[in-house]
Design a protein with these regions (language model features):
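Mixed-charge interfacial surface used for oligomerization/domain docking
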Residues: 9-33, 90-103, 109-112, 118-287
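Conserved phosphate-coordination/catalytic loops
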Residues: 61-68, 208-212
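Short secondary-structure transition/capping motifs
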Residues: 55-66, 87-91, 115, 119
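Active-site cofactor/cluster-binding pocket
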Residues: 64-105
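N-terminal glycine-rich anion-binding loop in soluble enzyme alpha/beta folds
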Residues: 2-66
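Structural beta-sheet core signal
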Residues: 3-5, 84, 113, 234
Length: 287
Protein backbone atom coordinates (compact mmCIF):
# COMPACT_ATOMS: atom_id res chain seq x y z
CA UNK A 1 0.00 0.00 0.00
CA UNK A 2 1.01 3.60 -0.61
CA UNK A 3 0.07 6.65 1.47
CA UNK A 4 -0.63 9.92 -0.38
CA UNK A 5 -1.16 13.17 1.54
CA UNK A 6 -1.48 16.89 0.89
CA UNK A 7 1.15 19.44 1.86
CA UNK A 8 -0.93 20.47 4.85
CA UNK A 9 1.20 17.70 6.35
CA UNK A 10 3.57 19.23 8.90
CA UNK A 11 6.25 16.53 8.97
CA UNK A 12 9.78 17.52 8.13
CA UNK A 13 11.05 16.21 4.83
CA UNK A 14 13.38 13.58 6.28
CA UNK A 15 10.44 11.97 8.10
CA UNK A 16 8.26 12.12 4.99
CA UNK A 17 10.94 10.28 3.03
CA UNK A 18 11.56 7.73 5.78
CA UNK A 19 7.85 6.87 5.85
CA UNK A 20 7.62 6.85 2.03
CA UNK A 21 4.70 9.30 1.96
CA UNK A 22 3.85 10.80 -1.42
CA UNK A 23 2.99 14.46 -0.86
CA UNK A 24 0.90 16.53 -3.28
CA UNK A 25 1.63 20.24 -3.01
CA UNK A 26 -1.07 22.87 -2.57
CA UNK A 27 -0.48 25.71 -5.07
CA UNK A 28 0.55 29.00 -3.45
CA UNK A 29 -0.04 32.46 -4.92
CA UNK A 30 1.56 35.79 -4.02
CA UNK A 31 -0.55 38.75 -5.13
CA UNK A 32 -2.17 36.53 -7.73
CA UNK A 33 1.03 35.05 -9.16
CA UNK A 34 2.25 31.47 -8.53
CA UNK A 35 4.86 31.30 -5.77
CA UNK A 36 7.44 28.45 -5.75
CA UNK A 37 6.71 26.94 -2.34
CA UNK A 38 7.35 23.29 -1.61
CA UNK A 39 7.88 21.03 1.38
CA UNK A 40 11.51 20.45 0.49
CA UNK A 41 12.51 24.07 -0.03
CA UNK A 42 15.46 25.19 2.18
CA UNK A 43 14.92 26.88 5.52
CA UNK A 44 16.06 30.23 4.11
CA UNK A 45 13.25 30.09 1.57
CA UNK A 46 10.75 29.20 4.29
CA UNK A 47 11.89 32.16 6.37
CA UNK A 48 11.50 34.44 3.36
CA UNK A 49 7.98 33.13 2.75
CA UNK A 50 7.04 33.72 6.37
CA UNK A 51 8.07 37.38 6.06
CA UNK A 52 5.94 37.68 2.93
CA UNK A 53 3.02 36.19 4.85
CA UNK A 54 3.48 38.70 7.67
CA UNK A 55 3.60 41.67 5.30
CA UNK A 56 0.04 42.99 5.31
CA UNK A 57 0.61 44.57 1.90
CA UNK A 58 0.80 41.11 0.36
CA UNK A 59 -2.10 38.87 -0.48
CA UNK A 60 -0.98 35.27 -0.18
CA UNK A 61 -3.51 32.60 -1.06
CA UNK A 62 -3.78 28.92 -1.86
CA UNK A 63 -6.08 26.87 -4.03
CA UNK A 64 -7.22 23.29 -3.80
CA UNK A 65 -5.03 20.43 -4.91
CA UNK A 66 -4.85 20.25 -8.69
CA UNK A 67 -6.25 17.31 -10.62
CA UNK A 68 -3.08 16.84 -12.66
CA UNK A 69 -0.93 16.76 -9.52
CA UNK A 70 -3.12 14.13 -7.87
CA UNK A 71 -3.14 11.97 -10.99
CA UNK A 72 0.65 12.25 -11.24
CA UNK A 73 1.00 11.14 -7.61
CA UNK A 74 -1.40 8.22 -8.01
CA UNK A 75 0.26 7.13 -11.26
CA UNK A 76 3.52 6.52 -9.41
CA UNK A 77 1.77 3.78 -7.42
CA UNK A 78 -0.77 2.63 -10.02
CA UNK A 79 -0.16 -1.04 -9.23
CA UNK A 80 -0.63 -0.61 -5.47
CA UNK A 81 -3.52 0.02 -3.11
CA UNK A 82 -3.45 3.77 -2.45
CA UNK A 83 -4.54 5.37 0.82
CA UNK A 84 -5.10 9.03 -0.02
CA UNK A 85 -5.61 10.92 3.24
CA UNK A 86 -6.34 14.62 3.42
CA UNK A 87 -7.12 17.32 5.95
CA UNK A 88 -10.72 18.02 6.93
CA UNK A 89 -12.91 18.56 3.89
CA UNK A 90 -14.24 21.85 5.25
CA UNK A 91 -10.72 23.27 5.04
CA UNK A 92 -10.71 22.96 1.26
CA UNK A 93 -13.97 22.24 -0.51
CA UNK A 94 -12.13 22.72 -3.81
CA UNK A 95 -9.81 19.84 -2.95
CA UNK A 96 -12.77 17.67 -2.02
CA UNK A 97 -14.39 18.33 -5.38
CA UNK A 98 -11.20 17.54 -7.29
CA UNK A 99 -10.64 14.35 -5.30
CA UNK A 100 -14.20 13.22 -6.00
CA UNK A 101 -13.72 13.91 -9.69
CA UNK A 102 -10.43 12.00 -9.87
CA UNK A 103 -11.82 9.01 -7.98
CA UNK A 104 -14.86 8.89 -10.26
CA UNK A 105 -13.06 9.36 -13.55
CA UNK A 106 -10.03 7.16 -12.90
CA UNK A 107 -11.18 3.68 -11.88
CA UNK A 108 -7.78 2.34 -12.95
CA UNK A 109 -6.44 3.48 -9.57
CA UNK A 110 -7.23 1.39 -6.49
CA UNK A 111 -7.78 4.27 -4.09
CA UNK A 112 -9.22 4.51 -0.58
CA UNK A 113 -10.01 8.11 0.32
CA UNK A 114 -9.76 9.13 3.99
CA UNK A 115 -10.95 12.47 5.34
CA UNK A 116 -8.79 13.03 8.42
CA UNK A 117 -11.39 15.40 9.97
CA UNK A 118 -8.49 17.49 11.33
CA UNK A 119 -5.96 20.19 10.39
CA UNK A 120 -2.19 20.85 10.63
CA UNK A 121 -0.64 19.07 13.65
CA UNK A 122 -3.66 16.82 14.24
CA UNK A 123 -3.83 15.92 10.54
CA UNK A 124 -0.10 15.25 10.72
CA UNK A 125 -0.19 12.88 13.68
CA UNK A 126 -2.93 10.90 11.91
CA UNK A 127 -1.04 10.62 8.62
CA UNK A 128 2.17 9.68 10.42
CA UNK A 129 0.50 6.82 12.27
CA UNK A 130 -1.22 5.56 9.11
CA UNK A 131 2.08 5.61 7.20
CA UNK A 132 3.82 3.73 10.00
CA UNK A 133 1.10 1.08 10.02
CA UNK A 134 1.44 0.63 6.26
CA UNK A 135 5.21 0.42 6.56
CA UNK A 136 4.83 -2.24 9.25
CA UNK A 137 2.70 -4.37 6.93
CA UNK A 138 -0.75 -3.90 8.47
CA UNK A 139 -3.51 -5.44 6.35
CA UNK A 140 -6.01 -3.11 4.69
CA UNK A 141 -9.09 -4.09 6.72
CA UNK A 142 -7.21 -3.72 10.00
CA UNK A 143 -5.74 -0.43 8.80
CA UNK A 144 -9.19 1.02 8.13
CA UNK A 145 -10.30 0.07 11.63
CA UNK A 146 -7.15 1.70 12.98
CA UNK A 147 -7.79 4.86 10.96
CA UNK A 148 -11.28 5.19 12.42
CA UNK A 149 -9.96 4.69 15.95
CA UNK A 150 -7.15 7.22 15.51
CA UNK A 151 -9.39 9.82 13.88
CA UNK A 152 -12.05 9.66 16.57
CA UNK A 153 -9.49 9.89 19.39
CA UNK A 154 -7.41 12.77 18.05
CA UNK A 155 -7.56 16.38 19.20
CA UNK A 156 -6.00 19.58 17.91
CA UNK A 157 -5.04 22.59 20.05
CA UNK A 158 -2.83 25.55 19.23
CA UNK A 159 -1.47 28.96 20.20
CA UNK A 160 -1.86 31.68 17.56
CA UNK A 161 0.30 34.80 17.85
CA UNK A 162 -0.92 36.41 14.62
CA UNK A 163 -4.23 37.94 15.72
CA UNK A 164 -4.65 39.53 12.30
CA UNK A 165 -5.01 35.99 10.97
CA UNK A 166 -8.05 35.64 13.22
CA UNK A 167 -9.33 38.93 11.80
CA UNK A 168 -8.71 37.79 8.21
CA UNK A 169 -10.62 34.55 8.81
CA UNK A 170 -13.55 36.28 10.49
CA UNK A 171 -12.88 34.97 14.00
CA UNK A 172 -11.97 38.36 15.47
CA UNK A 173 -12.89 41.98 14.80
CA UNK A 174 -10.27 44.43 13.56
CA UNK A 175 -10.33 46.54 16.72
CA UNK A 176 -9.78 43.50 18.93
CA UNK A 177 -7.01 42.29 16.64
CA UNK A 178 -5.23 45.64 16.92
CA UNK A 179 -5.68 45.92 20.68
CA UNK A 180 -4.81 42.27 21.26
CA UNK A 181 -1.64 42.56 19.21
CA UNK A 182 -0.63 45.69 21.13
CA UNK A 183 -1.17 43.81 24.40
CA UNK A 184 0.68 40.75 23.03
CA UNK A 185 -2.34 38.50 23.51
CA UNK A 186 -1.98 34.87 22.38
CA UNK A 187 -5.19 33.24 21.14
CA UNK A 188 -5.84 29.58 21.92
CA UNK A 189 -7.82 27.42 19.49
CA UNK A 190 -9.11 23.86 19.63
CA UNK A 191 -10.73 21.36 17.32
CA UNK A 192 -14.44 20.82 17.88
CA UNK A 193 -17.06 18.15 17.33
CA UNK A 194 -17.55 19.62 13.86
CA UNK A 195 -14.69 18.18 11.72
CA UNK A 196 -12.27 20.84 10.53
CA UNK A 197 -13.79 23.62 12.62
CA UNK A 198 -11.54 25.34 15.15
CA UNK A 199 -13.05 27.17 18.11
CA UNK A 200 -11.65 29.66 20.58
CA UNK A 201 -10.76 28.30 24.01
CA UNK A 202 -9.53 31.58 25.44
CA UNK A 203 -6.44 33.75 25.43
CA UNK A 204 -3.20 34.00 27.40
CA UNK A 205 -0.31 36.41 27.86
CA UNK A 206 2.63 34.02 27.49
CA UNK A 207 3.62 30.52 26.41
CA UNK A 208 3.83 29.22 29.98
CA UNK A 209 0.13 29.92 30.40
CA UNK A 210 -0.58 28.40 26.98
CA UNK A 211 1.31 25.21 27.76
CA UNK A 212 -0.33 24.98 31.18
CA UNK A 213 -3.69 25.03 29.43
CA UNK A 214 -2.63 22.44 26.86
CA UNK A 215 -1.36 20.07 29.54
CA UNK A 216 -4.58 20.43 31.53
CA UNK A 217 -6.71 19.76 28.44
CA UNK A 218 -4.73 16.63 27.65
CA UNK A 219 -4.99 15.37 31.23
CA UNK A 220 -8.74 15.99 31.21
CA UNK A 221 -9.09 14.14 27.90
CA UNK A 222 -7.07 11.22 29.24
CA UNK A 223 -9.39 10.90 32.24
CA UNK A 224 -12.51 11.15 30.11
CA UNK A 225 -11.30 8.54 27.61
CA UNK A 226 -9.59 6.36 30.24
CA UNK A 227 -6.45 6.70 28.17
CA UNK A 228 -3.25 4.78 28.72
CA UNK A 229 -0.84 6.45 26.29
CA UNK A 230 -0.57 9.35 23.84
CA UNK A 231 0.92 9.86 20.39
CA UNK A 232 1.55 13.51 19.48
CA UNK A 233 3.06 15.97 17.02
CA UNK A 234 3.91 19.61 17.72
CA UNK A 235 4.29 21.77 14.61
CA UNK A 236 5.94 25.18 14.64
CA UNK A 237 5.80 28.12 12.26
CA UNK A 238 7.77 31.19 13.23
CA UNK A 239 10.20 31.68 16.14
CA UNK A 240 8.43 29.39 18.60
CA UNK A 241 10.73 26.41 19.11
CA UNK A 242 11.39 27.50 22.70
CA UNK A 243 7.68 27.28 23.40
CA UNK A 244 7.28 24.00 21.53
CA UNK A 245 10.25 22.35 23.22
CA UNK A 246 8.98 23.46 26.63
CA UNK A 247 5.67 21.77 25.82
CA UNK A 248 7.46 18.63 24.63
CA UNK A 249 9.53 18.49 27.81
CA UNK A 250 6.47 18.86 30.00
CA UNK A 251 4.58 16.21 28.06
CA UNK A 252 7.45 13.84 28.74
CA UNK A 253 7.05 14.33 32.49
CA UNK A 254 3.38 13.36 32.68
CA UNK A 255 2.17 10.30 34.55
CA UNK A 256 1.38 8.45 31.32
CA UNK A 257 3.59 7.71 28.27
CA UNK A 258 3.61 10.41 25.59
CA UNK A 259 5.45 9.84 22.31
CA UNK A 260 5.87 13.32 20.84
CA UNK A 261 7.90 14.94 18.07
CA UNK A 262 8.46 18.60 17.18
CA UNK A 263 8.41 19.47 13.47
CA UNK A 264 9.06 22.74 11.67
CA UNK A 265 6.09 23.67 9.51
CA UNK A 266 6.58 23.12 5.79
CA UNK A 267 4.98 26.60 5.28
CA UNK A 268 3.56 25.59 1.93
CA UNK A 269 -0.10 26.28 2.73
CA UNK A 270 0.09 28.61 5.69
CA UNK A 271 -1.77 31.70 4.41
CA UNK A 272 -4.91 30.43 6.14
CA UNK A 273 -3.08 29.37 9.32
CA UNK A 274 -1.15 32.54 10.09
CA UNK A 275 2.66 32.89 10.05
CA UNK A 276 3.10 32.73 13.83
CA UNK A 277 1.85 29.74 15.81
CA UNK A 278 2.64 26.40 17.33
CA UNK A 279 0.09 23.64 17.70
CA UNK A 280 -0.32 20.18 19.17
CA UNK A 281 -2.11 17.23 17.63
CA UNK A 282 -2.51 14.17 19.81
CA UNK A 283 -4.14 10.76 19.72
CA UNK A 284 -5.24 9.07 22.95
CA UNK A 285 -5.08 5.29 23.20
CA UNK A 286 -7.03 3.29 25.76
CA UNK A 287 -5.01 0.19 24.97
Amino acid sequence: MKVVAGSALQLEQKTVKALDIEVVEYPLYLNGDPYPASMDMPQEAKDELRLLLKDKKNKVTTSGLREQDLIAAYSKSAKEKIITIHQAGKASTATQQVLKQVLTQHPEFDIEFVDAHHLTAAYTVIVQQVAEAVQNGMEFSELMEQVEYIRSNTRHIGAVYDLFYLYRTGRLGLTKAILGSAMKIIALLSSSKDPGVLVSIGKVKNYIQANNRFIQLLQDDMKQKEGKRVRAVISVIGPHFKEANDLKERLGKLEFPVQVEVHASNHSNMPHAGPDFYDLGYTIYDR
